Amino acid sequence: WAPIFDRYVISKLGRRRGWILITQVLLIFSIIGLGMTNPAMNAANVALLAIFVTFFSASQDIVIDAYRRESLSDNEQVLGASSYVLGYRIGMLSAGAGGLILADLMSYQFVYLIMALVMIGGVLITLIADEPVNFSEPSTFLDAVRNPFVEFFKRHGDSINNNISIPILILLFILLYKVGDTMAHSLSTNFYLEMGYTKTEIGTVVKVFGLMATLVGAFIGGLLSIKIGLYKSLISFGIFQAIATLGFSVLAVSAKSLMLLASVITLENLAAGMGYTAYLAFIANMTNKQFTATQFALMTAIMSLPRTLFSGSSGFLVESLGWENYFIFCSLIAFPAL
């Protein structure tokens, strides 16, 4: 549904801020409604409201991605991606940990209400923010659906040795860049448990060290990408991610050690934060500002495909290879993208 956000301007706030405001308001009411619904009495209503929350949340993400892309120049996309990762992770921690703490003190209805009211801050920011310079929207909805594809392939329409299509290579890179990291993470909790770590140890070490390392990685990744350039950063951070993934293989053959676990988690999340920052900036730079919402949404959908396509086979690979060799495989599979 991303072409809707490229095609229609429905508010005096502009094409981007108008849609951001609408999705935020609808999301607030959906969260409040979800909190006020009793699952035991109205399971169907809970399911419907959960769908609304998911839909409006995804819609907000699409338009905010477009807003960030259009508000920043190509050279500023790395810092924009770094700020996005920092804010997103802090928001996840605040909502997740904060929600659990509040749930011990009050009913879940009030927790949902508080979470919804916190979003009013985002509404206020939307109202006072500047609208990015608008390009002319597509003349018809069909153009909004078709033209982003046509424009992307025309803009990158060259080929290598008249054989390999550059647009296809770009899409394959987006698909494969994080595949090793994604596969390693897909079974990480099962791996920690099998290695003898308790759920408390996993929750404490992984959440605390992992979050802090991701935040630091996003910050460092943004600075280094500006210093050495985006494309060198993608290669360097990709190699770092592959090396960091090997830390899980070390865990697999080592005795239980919280210090070793914390070290591996820190290194892996540091690399992931650096790689993700450069990766998002690359995707942003591949979009045309006239079709930002549609092209960005399509590329991020491709980015998330490995989680669906490859994670399902991870269990079978572990049974066949064992944990040590599985993580070596996850490390090696990252190199085709590089």
Q: Where are the language model's segments positioned?
A:
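C-terminal transmembrane helical hairpin of 12-TM major facilitator-type secondary transporters
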Residues: Y231-Y279
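Juxtamembrane intracellular "pre-TM" segments in multi-pass secondary transporters
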Residues: E131-L169
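Helix-to-loop junctions at the C-terminal end of transmembrane segments
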Residues: W1-G14, V216-S233, V318-E319
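C-terminal ends and interior cores of transmembrane alpha-helices
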Residues: I20-A40, I239-K256
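Glycine-rich segments within core transmembrane alpha-helices of 12-TM secondary carriers
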Residues: V78-A103, T300-S311
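Short amphipathic helix-loop junctions that connect adjacent transmembrane helices
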Residues: S186-G203
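Loop-to-transmembrane helix entry/capping segments in MFS-fold secondary transporters
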Residues: D74-Y84, K199-T200, K289-M299
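Symmetry-related core transmembrane helices of the 12-TM Major Facilitator Superfamily/SLC fold
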Residues: I22-I28, F110-L127, N325-L338
